[in-house]
């Protein structure tokens, strides 16, 4: 073994520095989480109820990784944004925070949701094992623009818009007939937010 002290000689790290591209999009810590929240509150919360449905608009908080890692709490957000924007937008944003908490509650009490079908009729479903289809989905090469855009965004940034997540998940299961657990494994591997909990609910 090389005793020069050069850790690179141990070949412990991947040759492709995947984390570098994530650092262009994310900074960690409470300070940055609060800055991102305030930017959303002042620029994206108004119009949230309708705007959140359109991936190209800025009516999304992109706070999921910061909430996941405890850099900002739902309580801080809940009590800070009241009265700063139209009530319908604040209320809808609060409902999304509530849905997130409900998702964690479900997984805490029913951990089997991460590995088993809720509807047992699907236990014998003949899922496809087509590796080419799976790879095309993972890399964003399906030929369906909205699916490919979402999967490429996930790969490049570790994040995907909520509405697009629903589309790509539905495409994997209903169109490609690939087991949802395979898709969940991919999301957990490349998502900055580790989506197991919110996605399952």
Region spans (language model):
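Glycine/tryptophan-enriched, flexible segments
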Residues: 1-119
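Alpha-helical scaffolds flanking conserved acidic
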Residues: 91-94, 163-167, 186
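Helix-loop-helix junctions that connect adjacent transmembrane helices in secondary transporters/permeases
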Residues: 112-113, 117-143
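C-terminal substrate/ligand-recognition segments
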Residues: 141-166, 170-175
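C-terminal catalytic subdomain
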Residues: 175-181
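Beta-rich nucleic-acid/ligand-interaction surfaces
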Residues: 181-192
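Conserved small/polar residues in nucleotide/adenosyl-binding loops
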Residues: 193-199
């Amino acid at each position: 073994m090389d005793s020069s002290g050069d850790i690179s000689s141990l070949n412990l790290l991947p040759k492709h520095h995947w984390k570098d591209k994530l650092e262009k999009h994310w900074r960690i810590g409470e300070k940055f989480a609060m800055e991102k929240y305030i930017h959303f509150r002042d620029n994206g919360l108004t119009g949230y109820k309708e705007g959140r449905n359109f991936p190209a608009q800025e009516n999304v908080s992109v706070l999921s990784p910061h909430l996941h890692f405890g850099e900002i709490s739902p309580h801080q957000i809940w009590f800070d944004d009241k009265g700063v924007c139209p009530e319908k937008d604040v209320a809808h944003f609060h409902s999304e925070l509530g849905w997130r908490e409900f998702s964690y509650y479900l997984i805490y009490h029913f951990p089997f949701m991460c590995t088993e079908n809720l509807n047992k009729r699907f236990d014998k479903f003949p899922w496809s094992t087509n590796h080419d289809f799976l790879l095309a989905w993972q890399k964003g090469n399906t030929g369906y623009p909205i699916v490919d855009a979402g999967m490429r965004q996930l790969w490049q940034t570790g994040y995907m818009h909520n509405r697009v997540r629903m589309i790509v998940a539905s495409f994997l299961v209903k169109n490609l007939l690939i087991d949802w657990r395979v898709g969940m494994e991919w999301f957990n591997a490349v998502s900055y937010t580790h989506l197991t909990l919110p996605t399952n609910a």
